[in-house]
């Protein structure tokens, strides 16, 4: 079916009037061009045309091949009418080759396709989106030929048949009106004019991979370009082709199958590289991002971290990796030096890590948010697949683009990078540095652009060895590694906290996934990274000084990599600094950008001259970015020797912090006023002081320390603790979230069992935000003290105060289960406000009952006086400055006075007990010697001297040195009085030592027992003796078996022993590493195998002591 002449006239008239009304300026511009024979296009929007006349739309969709020539003729007539109506005819020249290019089809499945058309689409005008994978050479196409009749000399014009590959079919008979029926013609192609020829090119487009369904292989099809559409695109471009789907076949032969293929004859082609698909950047979008950075004007690092948290949110933590990926995606500024050489602005990143560390997740996310990107794996990539391939098609060689060429101007992600073969891997050296690929294949010599960012991931070769170089671990050559700006190592080392947090994060996201309001969507991230690509930041003088000094330090480092510490390192630093400035939405590279880049480079395997390599896997988001940056400034600038820049930067940080605090105070006051207007009750200043506390410590010496209202002075906090406002789980969670540095988000902490509103919200949330400060500050939570803790248990647990400089944030601070605990903080006087509360700075240590029983008298005697003196001294103090850890232990209540008096009575009665005196005598027989081979027992300091030392170290007891000596003399007098009651026991010991049984002699010959073993046995004897006054025969026999044959008694030796005991009792500050029972001889023998024999059993030691005495007497006689 064809259009009738009336329909053809209607279509021509309507289109001519439409063009004169809507595209008059474009026609005037075309007429001003100089070349008359060139081809000119006029782009017409189909939606606007169809709205003007729907009948034309129906004709166009039904007969596109017939309507398009009508549009061209109507456009030529419109240009002629415009030229005639124009007053300035001198500057306008009429053109013969006008083409109407239709674009902007309605978005519907009938007209818009993302997949390759099929047979049913033949003859329809469609728009197809794809990627150009191959372009052929531009050819000259003869589309018309003239044939002359040999009889009547009539000339017949024949057009080439598109469906038969533009072949010409000569006329069968002469079409002369005079009635010549000749069938013989002569071709006049030799005398054909250039007007009968046109440019011709074929390209191949492929379906976009991201638009395919699961398991689909991308298909491709040929697109025919003519006239001015030739060379409008290149390999790797994302294009949208508007054209007519047609079919063509080669000439038919007998007994051969027809080779039919579907092609797209293009009417218009739009390249989508300049405007990324799905991204719209307008003034409204710019204002949205400018408002975001205005919100974080005083704390821009927090705004940056919010963007980083939205980058690959399915991966927990990994702060350094996310920052590096974001900087690589932002990219640097490309520039041309004075010699005309182009210096690349794109950065390259290599992720080296164990399997399962999330490398591929970052690659997949980066491909999604980058408009022009290619994702490939090294295991199936060759040199031709990565660069360019020469393909022979239709008798000629063509170049087909590889992954790097397809990613020109975008991102190329290569997974399993070390799986690429060695000779294929060297082919990308030029693509990474010069960003071009030189090709000389099959007679084709050309150079293609590869201005792409390479993000690669690889596994180490075997197990990663930190002692070896990165080149040995990943089996990559140094020239290739030096082209990567950053090489981050992700080692999956043993870390229980990290494993627990990761498992909780994965299970939480699988069970009940929820989206956070702060996280940016993928479309917003995609738009932001497209927007910041337009920024051109300039280097500042301070940033130049820092980067140059760091480069010089890397060059001077003794362990430097000669292949890396070249001028490429300095260029990498500049590119990354510009990328961070883009990420921060700035036009100038500041000191903040330079410091961040140096810290990231130190975490990379390409750096390490200042701090050494860092495992980038176990890095979490900082709780306070400003304080972390302050620490980085102090650490890096001091080592770089830039003190002036350090002072300048610290002043800027203090100024930002002051402005931030002023704004927060203003906001809080405004909220308080609004609460008053509504009718809420506002607490008085005293109530606020009693219920809120600020417990912050800054890491830098220049930071301001804030005072802390002590909990003991808060009388109203008793009710909140007793009512159980906060559960122990919430309190432990709150303690765990506190970090060393302060910020506006955590300025209010625990106070009398209360948390601030913001802090309590974060703690009560089931998310894993409290783990963010795990890497920077590791603290063990302190268990809450029970209310039943008495004063006797709390009083001796006050530990010695260490110096302020001994506090280290990266070590475990407090351990309350069985080990000695030390509070690494410098505290002033510990104020005591009430009788029922202890300071939250006291950490208790659980000791044995024997130690408590021995000290009840001294402790209970001083409790009342000490409490009274402390109350009178510190009743007016309310604040304490602390530089230690930010966690605190809840106070425990005191026992009432009646209970204390009862304990004093029981203690006095127990001291008068002869059994207690006997134990004191046994305790006095201990002697202490240092020995390097003995193991330090954790229960040390159980002698009288250590007890006196503990009493002196307690800050709450106000004892003078004379009082301590008098107390020790009273204890020794009790020992002398009770010595008569154990005189018989000593005689038995001496008798057993002089006459050892046969089994003892055998034990001495086979394996000698150490003094430490004897000490442990004697201590066990003391513990058993606390239940009864008599010593069992089995225990005495056991002691006899482990004794040694004594030499003759020496009185001078006994005198020296007594002198040693008295001197050590008078000097409580002496330090002992181990202790043992006093041997009966001067010579001691150490065991060579075991401290304790494993062959002896308790049944063998169970011997009747009286029978042994009689047996020894018989042998002696």
From Swiss-Prot:
Map out region (Disordered) in residue numbers: 686-756, 868-893
* Residues reported to bind ATP: 353-360
Q: Which reaction does it catalyse?
A: ATP + H2O = ADP + phosphate + H(+)
The keyword Hydrolase belongs to this UniProt entry's keyword annotation: yes
Supply the EC number(s): 3.6.4.12
Q: Which UniProt keywords apply?
A: ATP-binding, DNA damage, DNA repair, DNA replication, DNA-binding, Helicase, Hydrolase, Nucleotide-binding, Nucleus
- Organism superkingdom: Eukaryota
**InterPro entries (UniProt xref):** AAA+_ATPase, MCM, MCM_dom, MCM_lid, MCM_OB, NA-bd_OB-fold, P-loop_NTPase
Question: Does this UniProt record's set of keywords contain DNA-binding?
Answer: yes
Q: Where is the MCM domain?
A: 301-506
The regions listed as transmembrane in this protein's record are none
Stretches of Polar residues bias are at 691-702, 722-750, 868-886
- What are the recorded Gene Ontology BP terms? DNA damage response; DNA replication; double-strand break repair via homologous recombination; regulation of DNA-templated DNA replication initiation
User: Main localization of the protein?
Assistant: nucleus
Subcellular location(s) per record: Nucleus
A Gene Ontology molecular function term for this protein is: helicase activity
Annotated GO CC locations: MCM8-MCM9 complex; nucleus
In terms of Pfam families, this protein maps to: MCM, MCM_lid, MCM_OB
Q: Where is the composition biased (Basic and acidic residues)?
A: 703-721
PANTHER family for this protein: DNA HELICASE MCM9 (PTHR11630:SF48), DNA REPLICATION LICENSING FACTOR MCM FAMILY MEMBER (PTHR11630)
What does the record note on quaternary structure? Component of the MCM8-MCM9 complex, which forms a hexamer composed of mcm8 and mcm9. Interacts with cdt1.
Q: Which family does it belong to?
A: Belongs to the MCM family.
* Cited function: Component of the MCM8-MCM9 complex, a complex involved in homologous recombination repair following DNA interstrand cross-links and plays a key role during gametogenesis. The MCM8-MCM9 complex probably acts as a hexameric helicase required to process aberrant forks into homologous recombination substrates and to orchestrate homologous recombination with resection, fork stabilization and fork restart. In eggs, required for MCM2-7 loading onto chromatin during DNA replication. Probably not required for DNA replication in other cells.
Could you identify this protein by its name? DNA helicase MCM9
Species the sequence originates in: Xenopus tropicalis
């Amino acid at each position: 079916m064809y259009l009738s002449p009336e329909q053809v006239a209607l279509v021509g008239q309507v289109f001519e009037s439409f063009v004169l009304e809507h595209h008059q300026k474009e026609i005037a511009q075309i007429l001003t061009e100089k070349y008359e024979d060139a081809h000119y296009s006029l782009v017409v929007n189909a939606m606007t045309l169809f709205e003007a006349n729907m009948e034309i739309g129906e004709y166009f969709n039904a007969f596109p091949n017939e309507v398009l020539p009508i549009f061209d003729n109507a456009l030529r007539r419109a240009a002629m009418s415009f030229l005639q109506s124009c007053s300035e005819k001198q500057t306008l020249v009429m053109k013969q080759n006008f083409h109407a290019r239709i674009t902007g089809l309605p978005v519907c499945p009938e007209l818009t396709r993302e997949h390759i058309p099929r047979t049913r689409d033949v003859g329809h005008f469609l728009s197809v989106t794809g990627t150009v994978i191959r372009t052929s050479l531009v050819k000259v196409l003869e589309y018309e030929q003239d044939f002359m009749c040999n009889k009547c000399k009539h000339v017949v014009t024949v057009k080439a048949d598109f469906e038969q590959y533009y072949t010409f079919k000569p006329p069968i008979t002469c079409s002369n009106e005079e009635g010549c029926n000749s069938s013989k013609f002569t071709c006049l192609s030799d005398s054909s004019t250039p007007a009968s020829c046109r440019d011709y090119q074929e390209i191949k487009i492929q379906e976009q991979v991201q638009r395919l369904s699961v398991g689909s292989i991308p298909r491709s099809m040929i697109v025919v370009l003519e006239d001015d559409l030739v060379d409008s695109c290149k390999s790797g471009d994302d294009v949208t082709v508007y054209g007519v789907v047609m079919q063509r076949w080669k000439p038919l032969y007998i007994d051969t199958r027809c080779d039919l293929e579907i092609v797209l004859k293009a009417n218009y082609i739009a390249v989508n590289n300049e405007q990324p698909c799905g991204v719209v950047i307008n003034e409204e979008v710019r204002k949205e991002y400018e408002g975001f950075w205005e919100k974080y004007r005083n704390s821009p690092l927090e705004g940056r971290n919010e963007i980083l948290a939205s980058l690959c949110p399915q991966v927990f933590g990994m702060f350094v990796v996310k920052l590096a990926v974001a900087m690589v995606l932002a990219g640097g500024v490309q520039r041309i030096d004075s010699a005309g050489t182009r210096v690349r602005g794109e950065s390259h990143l290599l992720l080296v890590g164990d399997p399962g560390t999330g490398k591929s997740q970052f690659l997949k996310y980066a491909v999604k948010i980058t408009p022009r990107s290619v994702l490939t794996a090294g295991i199936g990539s060759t040199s031709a697949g990565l660069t360019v391939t020469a393909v022979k098609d239709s008798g000629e060689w063509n170049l087909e683009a590889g992954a790097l060429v397809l990613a020109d101007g975008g991102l190329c992600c290569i997974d399993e990078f070390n799986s690429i073969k060695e000779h294929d891997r060297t082919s990308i050296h030029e693509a990474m540095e010069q960003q071009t690929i030189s090709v000389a294949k099959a007679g084709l010599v050309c150079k293609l652009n590869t201005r792409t960012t390479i993000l690669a991931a690889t596994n180490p070769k075997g197990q990663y060895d930190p002692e070896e170089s990165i080149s040995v671990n990943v089996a990559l050559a140094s020239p290739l590694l030096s082209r990567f700006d950053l090489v981050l190592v992700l080692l999956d080392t043993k870390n229980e906290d990290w494993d627990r947090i990761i498992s909780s994060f994965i299970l939480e996201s699988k069970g009940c996934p929820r989206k956070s309001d702060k996280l940016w969507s993928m479309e917003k991230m995609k738009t932001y990274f497209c927007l910041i690509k337009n920024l051109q930041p300039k280097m500042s003088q301070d940033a130049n000084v820092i980067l140059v000094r760091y480069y010089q330090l890397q060059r001077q480092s003794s362990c430097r990599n000669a292949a890396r510490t070249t001028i490429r390192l300095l260029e990498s630093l500049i590119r990354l600094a510009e990328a961070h400035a883009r990420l921060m939405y700035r036009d100038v590279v500041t000191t903040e950008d330079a410091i961040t880049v140096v810290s990231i480079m130190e975490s990379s395997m390409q750096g390490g001259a200042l701090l050494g390599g860092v495992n980038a896997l176990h890095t979490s988001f900082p709780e306070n970015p400003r304080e972390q940056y302050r620490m980085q400034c102090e650490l890096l600038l001091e080592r770089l020797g830039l003190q002036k820049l350090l002072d300048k930067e610290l002043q800027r940080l203090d100024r930002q912090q002051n402005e931030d605090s002023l704004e927060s105070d203003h906001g809080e006051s405004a909220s308080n006023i609004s609460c008053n207007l509504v009718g809420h009750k506002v607490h008085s200043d005293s109530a606020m002081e009693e219920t809120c506390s600020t417990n912050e410590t800054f890491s830098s010496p220049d930071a301001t320390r804030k005072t802390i209202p002590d909990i003991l002075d808060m009388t109203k906090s008793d009710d909140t603790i007793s009512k159980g406002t906060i559960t122990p789980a919430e309190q432990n969670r709150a303690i765990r979230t506190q970090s060393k540095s302060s910020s506006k988000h955590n300025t209010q902490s625990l106070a009398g069992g209360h948390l601030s509103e913001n802090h309590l919200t974060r703690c009560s949330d089931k998310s894993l935000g409290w783990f963010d400060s795990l890497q920077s500050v590791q603290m063990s939570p302190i268990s809450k003290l029970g209310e039943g803790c008495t004063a006797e248990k709390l009083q001796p647990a006050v530990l010695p105060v260490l110096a302020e400089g001994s506090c280290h944030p990266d070590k475990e601070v407090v351990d309350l289960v069985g080990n000695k605990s030390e509070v690494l903080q410098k505290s002033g006087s510990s104020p005591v406000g009430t009788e029922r509360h202890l300071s939250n700075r006291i950490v208790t240590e659980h000791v044995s009952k024997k130690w408590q029983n021995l000290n009840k008298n001294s402790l209970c005697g001083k409790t009342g006086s000490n409490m009274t003196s402390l109350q009178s001294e510190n009743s007016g103090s309310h604040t304490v400055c602390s530089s230690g850890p930010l966690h605190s232990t809840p106070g425990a209540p005191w026992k009432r006075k009646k209970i204390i008096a009862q304990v004093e009575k029981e203690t006095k009665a127990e001291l008068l007990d002869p059994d207690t005196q006997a134990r004191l005598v046994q305790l006095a027989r201990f002697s202490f010697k240092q020995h390097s081979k003995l193991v330090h027992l954790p229960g040390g300091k159980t002698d009288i001297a250590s007890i006196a030392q503990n009493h002196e170290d307690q800050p709450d007891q106000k004892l003078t040195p004379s009082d301590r000596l008098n107390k020790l003399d009273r204890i020794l007098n009790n020992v002398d009085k009770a010595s008569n009651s154990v005189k018989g026991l000593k005689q038995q010991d001496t008798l057993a030592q002089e006459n050892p049984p046969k089994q003892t002699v055998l034990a001495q010959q086979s394996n000698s027992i150490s003094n430490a073993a004897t000490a442990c046995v004697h201590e066990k004897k003391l513990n058993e003796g606390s239940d009864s006054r008599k010593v069992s025969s089995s225990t005495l026999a056991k002691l006899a078996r482990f004794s040694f044959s004594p030499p003759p008694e020496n009185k001078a030796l006994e005198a020296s022993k007594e002198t040693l005991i008295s001197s050590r009792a008078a000097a409580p500050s002496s330090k002992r590493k181990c202790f043992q029972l006093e041997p009966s001889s001067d010579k001691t023998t150490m065991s060579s195998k075991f401290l304790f024999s494993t062959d002896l059993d308790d049944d063998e030691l169970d011997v009747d002591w009286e029978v042994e005495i009689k047996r020894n007497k018989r042998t002696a006689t």
